[in-house]
């Protein structure tokens, strides 16, 4: 039985989130948590929190055994982009894009 957890509108670009997500896709959850714990990237803390939530959902809602869980799927999709203006020289302005993403983690038993 696959169980999911979703974090929406995380203040992180999807491109940077996918770098970390690719490292833990398909791994057992205990090994994935170890990798995320030692990664220095901002995305690793967010993905770790969502993964822990998915594990708790699987244990509570489905009665799954934690030792048998694997990261079945992990998706980092683009969320809404906030557009801001940065003042530049000679009275000009340039756009600043504050990107966000949606992180979805799916765990299942072997």
UniProtKB/Swiss-Prot annotation:
It comes from the Bacteria. GO terms for cellular component: cytosolic large ribosomal subunit. Keywords: Ribonucleoprotein, Ribosomal protein, RNA-binding, rRNA-binding. GO terms for molecular function: rRNA binding; structural constituent of ribosome. GO terms for biological process: translation. Pfam families: Ribosomal_L22. NCBIfam families: rplV_bact. Part of the 50S ribosomal subunit. This protein binds specifically to 23S rRNA; its binding is stimulated by other ribosomal proteins, e.g. L4, L17, and L20. It is important during the early stages of 50S assembly. It makes multiple contacts with different domains of the 23S rRNA in the assembled 50S subunit and ribosome. Belongs to the universal ribosomal protein uL22 family. This is Large ribosomal subunit protein uL22. It comes from Nitrosococcus oceani (strain ATCC 19707 / BCRC 17464 / JCM 30415 / NCIMB 11848 / C-107). The gene is rplV.
